[in-house]
Amino acid sequence: GDRLFIGHHGAPGLSSHAEPKRAFGKLADRFTVVTFDARGSGESDHVGPYTHEQWVADIDAIRERFGAERFVMGGGSYGGFIALEYALAHPERVEALVLRDTAARNYGEVAIRNAKARAHEFPAITDDILERIFSGTIIDNDDYRRCFAAIAPLYDVKHDPEATAKRIAATRFNYESNNYAFAVNLKSYDLRDRLHEIGVPVLITVGRHD
């Protein structure tokens, strides 16, 4: 389609364009759907700053590259944080928002509580691993790989160890992006008092098991 849709992935330093492609790719019959590896993730350069402001600026550069005055912004999980940040920074450029499994504030405590509730199913999930992920104190990329391998079953409705192992092997990890996101960005992330400023249509979806 002629209208532009930009989809932003979650999990800085872990996820990639493949995630929003799965979530939003079916809209390609109505939109030009663009997904990408955000700065510090996937095959994009692992060069900071890894701030919300920079990620918003990167989205705007993509919008400009496609020559769109306005577009539909989509994001899942942490990508939803950035979608909201973009909509508030550039309200005149957003036609609508699609938010998947996300929040307008730091939900770390809720995520940790939910993870601990299922930890008995997966013994590799320890308090130390959850603390390091959500406090942004991962040591290096090998440590990030080990931490994600422990919590990866939480991302599947039905855990498939072989599929999980393949996914981890194919992932390009960047612990610095994760650490900055959780140790710095999320400490001040709370947009609840500004949500009333968003005047475009918003579709909010959430998975029953998310």
What are the residue ranges of the model-derived segments?
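Conserved alpha/beta-hydrolase catalytic His-Asp/Glu region
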Residues: 133-185, 194
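Short beta-strand/loop motif that positions the catalytic acidic residue
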Residues: 198, 204-206
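Conserved HGGG/HGGXW glycine-rich cap/lid loop of the alpha/beta-hydrolase fold
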Residues: 1-46, 63
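Conserved hydrolase catalytic core segment
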Residues: 69-112
